[in-house]
C-alpha cells in the first residue's frame, strides 16, 4: 500500500483518539520497499555469509553490514560486545551419578545430559521441588518449607494445570514460569547446586527432546555444533535433563508414582515438595575445546522528538545469526530465520530516519547475536542495557517474518495451520499486554493482514520462550514476537531467499512502522500484565 497518491489527509487511527496524519508518516512508510527488502536479504542469505554461524566469519560480515546500513541511514551504530564461551560438551566423560543404599549408578547421554560452560562437579542429597516455581503474585511456591541449600533439586518441566482453562497460570498456553531458565534461576536463588529437569509425567505433548527429534537433521546438526554461553552470565548452576526412568526411580522415595504426584499438585495447587531420603547425586560436567571469544549486538538509537519523553525507548529487534554449514558442506542460508527479521530492523531504521517527523519517544534498533545458541545476545543486553529497561516501553521482535506458514514435522499433530497463510501474521505473547494487541489491531486497519494469536494457546512447542523478546518479558517489558510461522524449510539448507513472500514481508514491516508510531507517540504506552491468566478471563 502506497500513501502518496491520496490527495487528502488520511488519519491513521492508532491506540487512542489521537491520530497520526499522512503528512507525518508517509515518507517512512513509503520507504519500506520490496526491491530493498529483496536486495538486502539476497545478500544476507547468500553463500558469501556461510550461514552466519555465531562467532564464525559470516556472522562477523553480518555485524559489519548491519552497522554500515545504520550509518548510511544517518544513525550511529554501537557494536555492543557480547563475551561468549564456546565449548563442546564431552558426553563420554560427563555424567549423573545416583547413590542409594551403598550403590552407585552412572547415567550419560541420552538418559541424562546438559550443557555447562565449565568443568564442574557438584554433589548433594536430592530433593523434589514440584515444578520448581515461585510465583508470589499467584500465592504459589514449590519451595515453601523446602530446604534446597546445597541440594540437587528434581523438578517437573512446564507448569501446573497446563491443560486447564481455569488455571491460575494460563492453562491454554504456558507462562514464563514454565521455562527452564526461570526454574534454574529460582533454584539458584534458593541455594541449590544443580537442577534435574524431567518432562512432566502426565504430559499431553512431546518432551523437548522429542520435539527436537521431529526436525529432520536436527540431531546430526546439533551434535556437531559447539555450545555457547555468556561469559559472566547470571546463571551459575548446571541443569541436567533426565529421563522418565531416572525421575521415577528417585521419586519412589515419596511412596507415590510420578503421575500421581503431578496430579496432586495440579489438583490442589499445594506443593508436594520434599526430601528424597536415601538418594544423593553427583553431577559431573566436562567440556572440550573451550575458548573465549566476543560477538556483538548491533544497536542504533533514533532520539525522540519530545524532551519529556525522549528518555523512554521503543525497541525493534531481531537476531542475525543462523546455523552455518551442514556436514555435506551446504549452507543453512537462514533467509527466513532470521535474515528476514534482520532486514526488517534495518529497513525500519532507514524508514524512521528518513521520515521528516520523529516519534516523541526514542527508538532503539537492536540486532542481537547468538539467538540460535540460546538467546545469548538478548540475555546479555537485558543484563547490560544500552538504555534503561525501566523506561523501555515496548519491544517489537521479528523472527521469521518472510514465509507462509505450512505444516511440518515440528508442528504435526500439535497445532492447526490454515490452508492459506499468504496474508497471515502470528503475534505471540499478546496476553502479556492487551494494550499492545489493541495498538497493533488498530494500525492493521490500514494494512489488512490477518492477525493470528494461536501460539498463545499452545503449550507443546512453547514458542514464546524461543526468541529474543523473551528476555525482555522476564524484566516485565511488553515484548511480542512477530512471526509468520514454521514451515518444512525451518532450520534446513532449503531456507532460501527464493521462497520468501516479499509482499507479505513488506506489509508486516509497514504494520510495525505504524505500531511503532503508536508506541512512540501516544501519551500512555502499553502496560505489561504480570499474570496473563487473569488478563485473559
Where are these regions (language model features)?
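Alpha-helical metal-binding/catalytic segments enriched in His/Glu/Asp
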Residues: 179-180, 298-302, 316-375, 512
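A conserved hydrophobic secondary-structure block that centers on an alpha-helix together
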Residues: 130-212
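His/Asp/Glu-rich mid-to-C-terminal helical/loop segments that flank catalytic regions of hydrolases
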Residues: 350, 483, 487-537
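Soluble metallo-hydrolase cores and metallopeptidase-like ectodomains found primarily
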Residues: 20-25, 104-145, 229-334, 350, ...
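Noncatalytic luminal/extracellular "stalk/propeptide" segments of secretory-pathway proteins
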Residues: 24, 50-166, 275-279, 284-286, ...
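Second-shell loop/turn segments in exported
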Residues: 23-31, 47-58, 113-117, 128, ...
